[in-house]
From Swiss-Prot:
Transmembrane segments: none
Reaction catalyzed: a 3-demethylubiquinol + S-adenosyl-L-methionine = a ubiquinol + S-adenosyl-L-homocysteine + H(+); a 3-(all-trans-polyprenyl)benzene-1,2-diol + S-adenosyl-L-methionine = a 2-methoxy-6-(all-trans-polyprenyl)phenol + S-adenosyl-L-homocysteine + H(+)
Protein name from the UniProt record: Ubiquinone biosynthesis O-methyltransferase
Function: O-methyltransferase that catalyzes the 2 O-methylation steps in the ubiquinone biosynthetic pathway.
Top-rank lineage group of the source organism: Bacteria
Name of the gene this protein is made from: ubiG
EC number(s) per entry: 2.1.1.222, 2.1.1.64
First-level EC class: transferase
Length: 243
């Protein structure tokens, strides 16, 4: 698959793209702006691999891959990974880091909707992590992910719940008090309630299998997966073979 630039960018927020392009050079700095992503990556990788019955030999699409943190970790598990993003700078960082690390990943600058038009039913696993809250039309992304996965395949989403606790934890706490991520990273209006996400899933051939919360304890400085989806949460869906 050739890396190419999409010209049909109806579901792209240029302001969101600019935010991530501004800090792209520090994507792989373990103590930089993306430190939380590096910290949670082993948790989400293990959860994805567990519910996908392993990743070895599978064709995987990472939607909203950014600088490639999750993409690389899945490739190291033996997956054949394509990373999809609309940010030119993060993709350049991802390509260079993969080259330096000796990992083979195909990074493509394209919207998920256009990719779905060209590669429907081509992937065993689709991941869309920490991306839905950064696009104008997350429902469209969910539908595109459902189109891209093969019957019998798995699709994983993660995002932030929309409520007062999430605002306090993810914006006031993480951006202003603890300064875990840059100010302005998130917009509470773009957060997505689990019921909304699952309604979009129900409009597709996907069916919910698992939902789990991602929790941070500022006293221990540790992340964990546990029940409770008040703030960050992940959803595993499966596309039935008969659909």
């Amino acid at each position: 698959m050739k890396a190419e630039q999409n010209t049909d960018a109806h579901n792209v927020d240029r302001g969101e793209i600019a935010k991530f392009e501004a800090v792209a050079s520090r994507w792989w700095d373990l103590e930089g702006e993306f430190k939380p992503l590096h910290r949670i990556n082993p948790l989400r990788l293990d959860w994805i691999a567990q519910h996908a019955n392993g990743l070895f030999g599978k064709k995987v699409l990472d939607v909203g891959c950014g600088g490639g943190i999750l993409s690389e970790s899945m490739a190291r598990e033996g997956a054949n990974v394509t990373g999809l993003d609309m940010g030119a700078e993060p993709l350049q960082v991802a390509r260079l880091h993969a080259l330096e690390s000796g990992v083979n990943i195909d990074y493509v600058q394209q919207t998920v909707e256009e990719h779905a038009d060209r590669f429907a039913g081509q992937y065993d696993v689709v991941t869309c992590m920490e991306m839905l809250e950064h696009v104008p039309d997350p429902r469209s992304v969910v539908h595109a992910c459902a189109k891209l996965v093969k019957p019998g395949g798995e699709v994983f989403f993660s995002t932030l719940n929309r409520n007062s606790k999430s605002w306090l934890m993810a914006i006031v706490g993480a951006e202003y008090i603890l300064r875990m991520v840059p100010r302005g990273t998130h917009d509470i209006k773009k957060f997505i309630r689990p019921g909304e996400l699952l309604n979009w899933v129900d409009e597709t051939p996907l069916r919910e299998r698992h939902i789990i919360g991602l929790h941070y304890n500022p006293l221990t400085n540790r992340f964990k997966l546990a029940p409770g989806v008040d703030v960050n949460y992940m959803v595993h869906t499966h596309r039935n073979i008969t659909d």
